[in-house]
UniProtKB/Swiss-Prot annotation:
The gene is ANKRD49. The modification Phosphoserine is found at S48. GO terms for cellular component: nucleus. ANK repeats lie at residues 77-105, 106-135, 139-168, 172-205. GO terms for biological process: cell differentiation; positive regulation of DNA-templated transcription; spermatogenesis. It is found in: Nucleus. Keywords: ANK repeat, Differentiation, Nucleus, Phosphoprotein, Repeat, Spermatogenesis. This is Ankyrin repeat domain-containing protein 49.
Length: 238
């Protein structure tokens, strides 16, 4: 997803989230401002003109973009991870594996970009070359936060298998579970997180809200929290 992407369409009431007036949208906008248009509606939901335009991109177009960035392999790796250009990612890492944890101006790594776009094969390749699953952005988001925000459950599962912290908190004290709870389409991710033996569902964000508080207000899957109801002695994560 390109950082300069802007959604000029009006939010769809059926797809947008019903946050309370006190919900901390500021952190989400500051953290993923290049991904979230006004109203916190995901750019991946619906058939926007941007989606159609990206679908029309040809292989020749992608190759041209790569050629333009060849002299800046770090920039190219970030772009390739975001665009699911697995072969390009493999080539760049074989040439210089130290670029695997390169960062953009917001401290997003290639792993963050692949995670929030759901590119599992790219995620696998990056981690195989030493990508840091604990890397944080300027606002404290880990790759797991990025995957869970957009309901990329398969990516989230893979990150957890490679020691990602299921209870990691951003600067606003948001956990991956908080972010999944705020997404109406996050059933798979919620189930994945809630069934994790190390989950701490009682953690609160900077507004003193638990993930269940957010799920009850914004989604239809708050009943899933019954999985951890009464769980006061979850195993500590070493």
């Amino acid at each position: 997803m390109e950082k300069e992407k802007v959604n000029d369409e009006k939010p769809d009431p059926e797809n947008s989230l019903d946050f309370s007036e006190h919900f901390n949208q500021l952190e989400l906008l500051e953290t993923h401002g290049h991904l979230i248009p006004t109203g916190t509606q995901s750019l991946w939901i619906g058939n926007s003109d941007d989606d159609e335009e990206q679908d029309e991109k040809t292989e020749e177009w992608y190759q041209l973009q790569e050629k333009k960035m060849e002299k800046d392999p770090s920039k190219l790796l970030l772009w390739a991870a975001e665009k699911n250009r697995l072969t390009t990612v493999q080539r760049l890492l074989s040439e210089r594996a130290t670029h695997v944890n390169t960062r953009d101006e917001d401290k997003y790594t290639p792993l963050h970009r692949a995670a929030y776009n759901g590119h599992l094969d790219v995620v696998r390749e990056l981690i195989a070359h030493g990508a840091d699953v604990h890397a944080v952005t300027v606002d404290g988001w880990t790759p797991l936060h990025s995957a869970c925000k957009w309901n990329n459950a398969r990516v989230a599962s893979f990150l957890l298998q490679h020691d990602a912290d299921v209870n990691a908190q951003t600067k606003g004290l948001l956990t991956p579970l908080h972010l999944a709870a705020g997404n109406r389409d996050s059933k798979d991710t919620l189930e994945l997180l809630l069934m994790n033996r190390y989950i701490k569902p009682g953690l609160k964000n900077s507004l003193e809200e638990t993930a269940f508080d957010i799920a009850r207000r914004t989604g239809i899957y708050h009943y899933l929290f019954e999985i951890v109801e009464g769980c006061t002695n979850c195993s500590p994560q070493s």
